[in-house]
Swiss-Prot record:
The chain crosses the membrane at residues 330-350. Serine/threonine-protein kinase that may function as a signaling receptor of extracellular matrix component. Binding to pectin may have significance in the control of cell expansion, morphogenesis and development. Belongs to the protein kinase superfamily. Ser/Thr protein kinase family. Induction: Induced by INA and wounding. The modification Phosphothreonine is found at residues 393, 563, 568. Disulfide bonds join 234-249, 243-260, 262-276, 282-295, 289-304, 306-318. This is Wall-associated receptor kinase 2. It comes from Arabidopsis thaliana. Residues 351-732 are cytoplasmic.
Length: 732
């Protein structure tokens, strides 16, 4: 009996302790005031709100209006927020600038604090206000609004008629003081007052005409307060906290203390012992069960039950179970399908292997057909040891030219097409796709590769390598971006604006490169097709000699070779044309024609030239003989200061184009004379430094070709090219 009495006393003591610690409200507590619900820990009478903190004690007046202190309550959130209405501050003036009204807001929030969801706002012209707060520490800030008319932009509080700044959380004392810079005399008609107030973010939309005049007659604004239980954390209160069943505790984000919330699957008031009640997901349609399943509510959750003949998957969906006989046929079908797929995959792999082998054999066939064996033989055989030819792959060339797209075409000619290519390292090159038809042209292509690979000169286009795996071979050059000398002198793509200094320098550079080929290369090289269309110019107008498809290496023990005549009409050496004997003087003659083109600006062979032979060499001689030398010189070139230089250049051109090769100078001598001519000044008179006109006439007069030499075409794969078209065979 004594044990039972002891247990009864303990139970009574526990219930009294629980009521004291958790402070649960009485059953008769008011739960609504007007249209605002009053929920624990808030209350309106003793025993109905959280004990020990008068901040939770709200007042419901006779008009059914709920107040927190002197602030009307809008609503409350059990997650830790209370919305109230806070009076605005203002200062007003008459038209003379005399103060007529002043209200400064001063508010104490008890144990509650300002939320960071509020904004400090100032409305008025030439106005400013201060916000002073205190809590754990003091904080002050201010805002300035400037304007001179009521036509400021609506909806914006950026400082013109309206200013708005954030407010930090955690402060329990607020003081707002409005001011004016000049007491509003100039704006009194539309803005007699300065207004300052706190307002919840997004709850004030500025309208200049209404707000600057009387702030739309609004005296209070919604403000968000943070609240929490006590001054300890969840860990410190442990089970002694106010949180009820099926709830959890979390530390307040607005300052000290803690708040409560219902667990997932429960809803209600977490501050009451049984405030968090289970949510019936099956009734509230908060479940995700499929149409074939049945929802079953459980405490804090739910289950999706599948009917007979169905099974539940991971997404709470019910799928029909597979019958044994159906499963057996499914196995057979899947086995057959997988087996067939394996066989087809094997056949596909075999086809790919065969296709790869055929492609490899085809590339090897093209390699041999395009002279790969010949190239390897010549590189590895007797001859110069400095040959360095890079072999590019078919795949690399296709990617570099974007599949040989027509937008990449730089030009087309008798020997093929030239594309602009971009290599993987982003370097730009010119890719020449040869147009070959027989064995001799393959040999000429390989010859061009070998010749260019041995040349290292700044005025000779540099070959980077070749690709022989394609149906027609490809040659990869450095990219020269400013066209040919022919384009600049006669073409329509560029203005014919080369000055005499440009032309003399170009002539000197070409002469120097030919002298190098004839005298300084490991084995002498005769270009055999020197013409303006085979001289490229870069962006600095530096000359680059190109197109070595017709070039020949001269053995060290020979001075000339007997070959099939090859070249271009107008530039072709008459002696070589008549005898078939090729030597370095053939290049000298062709260079002389190029020099005449630079002097005259006229084409080497032109059938539309009036009163002058069609061949430029004959035309030059005829003009000199008839005292019309000045007429043949390009008008853009000659002036009073360079007549002697042009006369000297004409003399060099005349010597280079003599009929007999033995009477022509060597390219080394021509290059030296042109280089010396470049550095000469014009301070000496014409008569003191240069030969008489008669001597020029003699030099040019003996060069007139016969009618046969003038109109006959050269023999070879490049002999019938039209010199009036854009020729870029050199790999631009």
């Amino acid at each position: 009996m004594k044990v039972q009495e002891g247990l009864f006393v303990v139970a009574v003591f526990y219930l009294a302790y629980t009521q004291l610690v958790k402070g649960q409200p009485r059953k008769e507590c008011q739960t609504r005031c007007g249209n605002v619900a009053v929920e624990y820990p808030f209350g309106t009478s003793p025993g109905c709100y959280y004990p020990g903190d008068e901040s939770f004690n709200l007042t419901c007046n006779e008009q059914e209006k709920l107040f927190f202190g002197n602030m009307p309550v809008i609503n409350m959130s059990l997650s830790g927020q209370l919305r109230v209405r806070l009076v605005r501050s203002r200062v007003c003036y008459d038209s003379q600038g005399k103060q007529t009204d002043y209200i400064a807001q001063r508010t104490t929030l008890g144990n509650f604090t300002l939320s960071e969801l509020n904004r400090f706002t100032v409305v008025g012209c030439n106005s400013y206000a201060f916000l002073r707060t205190s809590g754990v520490e003091k904080y002050s800030t201010g805002c300035i609004s400037i304007c001179d008319s009521a036509t400021t932009k609506n909806g914006s509080c950026s400082g013109e008629g309206c200013c708005q700044i954030p407010v930090p959380r955690g402060y329990s004392f607020v003081r707002v003081k409005p001011h004016s810079f000049h007491n509003h005399p100039t704006v009194h008609l539309f803005n007699p007052c300065t207004y300052a107030f706190l307002v919840e973010d997004g709850m004030f939309d500025f309208h200049a005409l209404e707000d600057l005049n009387n702030l739309r007659n609004v005296t209070t604004f919604p403000v968000v307060l943070d609240w929490s239980i006590g001054d300890k954390t969840c860990k410190q209160v442990e089970y002694r906290g106010v949180c009820g069943g099926n709830s959890t505790c979390f530390d307040s984000t607005g300052g000290t203390g803690y708040n409560c919330k219902c667990l997932e699957g429960f809803e209600g008031n977490p501050y009451l012992p049984n405030g968090c009640q289970d949510i019936n997901e099956c009734i509230s349609s908060r479940h995700n069960c499929s149409e074939h399943s049945t929802c079953e509510n459980t405490k804090g959750s739910f289950n999706c039950n599948c009917p007979s003949g169905y099974r539940k998957d991971s997404l709470n969906s019910c799928t029909r179970k597979v019958r044994p006989e159906y499963f057996r046929w499914t196995q057979i079908f899947l086995g057959t399908t997988i087996g067939f797929s394996v066989i087809m995959l094997g056949i596909s792999c075999l086809q790919q292997k065969i296709k790869h082998r055929k492609n490899t054999e085809l590339r090897q066939k093209f390699f041999e057909q395009n002279g790969g064996g010949m190239l390897i033989q010549r590189v590895s055989g007797a001859g110069p040891s400095n040959v360095d030819v890079k072999i590019f792959t078919e795949k690399g060339m296709k990617e570099a030219t974007n599949g040989y797209h027509e937008s990449r075409i730089l030009g087309q000619g008798g020997q093929g097409t030239v594309y602009k290519g971009i290599l993987p390292d982003n370097s730009i090159v010119a890719i020449k796709k040869a147009r070959l038809g027989n064995r001799s042209q393959v040999e000429q292509f390989i010859n061009e590769v070998l010749v260019l690979s041995q040349i290292n000169h700044r005025n000779v286009v540099k070959v980077l390598g070749c690709c022989l795996e394609t149906e027609v071979p490809l040659l990869v050059y450095e990219f020269i971006n400013s066209g040919t000398l022919f384009d600049h002198l006669h073409g329509s793509l560029y203005d014919s604006s080369l000055t005499w200094e440009h032309r003399l320098r170009i002539a000197t550079e070409v002469a120097g490169s030919l002298a190098y080929l004839h005298s300084s290369a490991s084995i002498p090289i005769i270009h055999r097709d020197i013409k303006t269309a085979n001289i490229l110019l870069d962006k600095n107008l530096t000359a680059k000699v190109a197109d070595f498809g017709a070039s020949r290496l001269i053995p060290m023990d020979k001075e000339q070779l007997t070959t099939i005549v090859q070249g271009t009409l107008g530039y072709l050496d008459p002696e070589y044309y008549n005898t078939g004997l090729l030597n370095e003087k053939s290049d000298v003659y062709s260079f002389g024609v190029v020099l005449m083109e630079l002097l005259s600006g006229q084409k080497a062979l032109c059938f539309e030239r009036p009163h002058c032979p069609k061949n430029l060499v004959s035309c030059f001689a005829s003009a000199t003989k008839n005292n019309r030398f000045h007429e043949i010189i390009d008008g853009q070139v000659m002036n009073e200061d360079n007549q002697r230089e042009i006369q000297e250049a004409a003399r060099i051109a005349a010597e280079c184009t003599r009929l007999m090769g033995e009477e022509r100078p060597r390219m080394k001598e021509v290059a030296a004379e042109l280089e010396a001519l470049r550095v000469k000044t014009t301070k000496y008179k014409w008569s003191d430094q240069y030969r008489e006109t008669g001597e020029i006439e003699h030099l040019l007069g003996v060069q007139i070709l016969s009618a046969q030499g003038e109109t006959s075409s050269s023999i070879g794969y490049d002999s019938i090219r039209n010199v009036t078209t854009l020729d870029i065979e050199a790999g631009r």
